[in-house]
């Protein structure tokens, strides 16, 4: 089972995690207080836990995405940032993470200078393909 939250603090309990399938994944990204704290999620049996906070291991935060997405959109003067562009950025991010870097405790570095460069071309190509690029 997978939980991806960007909702409200404390809405997931350890007891809820215990009802999930083995090796559950929880991305509790509500800020500043996550849906469940990492220690509580692990106590419930979660295998992978990430939050949006830099003071917990395995931070997953939108701060990682903004620079690359906006740079790519600005460079082609995109009139919109559409779903296709976001998917292109997501795929580029997934390709950036090596097997050696990926672990249960670290999906990727919270601030990674490679991200913006990795996303530029796929994002720009997607903007052009979907007709939102003006350059």
Show which residues each predicted segment covers:
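Rossmann-like NAD(P)-binding element
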Residues: 1-30, 34-35
């Amino acid at each position: 089972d997978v939980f991806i939250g960007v909702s409200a603090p404390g809405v997931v309990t350890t007891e809820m995690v215990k009802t999930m399938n083995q090796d559950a994944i929880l991305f509790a990204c509500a800020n500043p207080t996550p849906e469940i704290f990492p220690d509580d999620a692990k106590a419930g049996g979660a295998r992978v836990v990430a939050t949006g906070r830099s003071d917990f291991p395995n931070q997953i935060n939108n701060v990682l995405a903004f620079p690359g997405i906006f740079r790519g959109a600005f460079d082609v003067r995109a009139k919109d940032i559409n779903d296709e562009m976001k998917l292109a950025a997501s795929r580029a991010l997934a390709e950036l993470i090596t097997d050696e870097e990926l672990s249960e405790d670290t999906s990727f570095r919270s601030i990674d200078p490679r991200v913006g460069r990795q996303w530029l071309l796929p994002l720009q190509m997607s903007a052009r393909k979907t007709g939102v690029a003006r350059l």
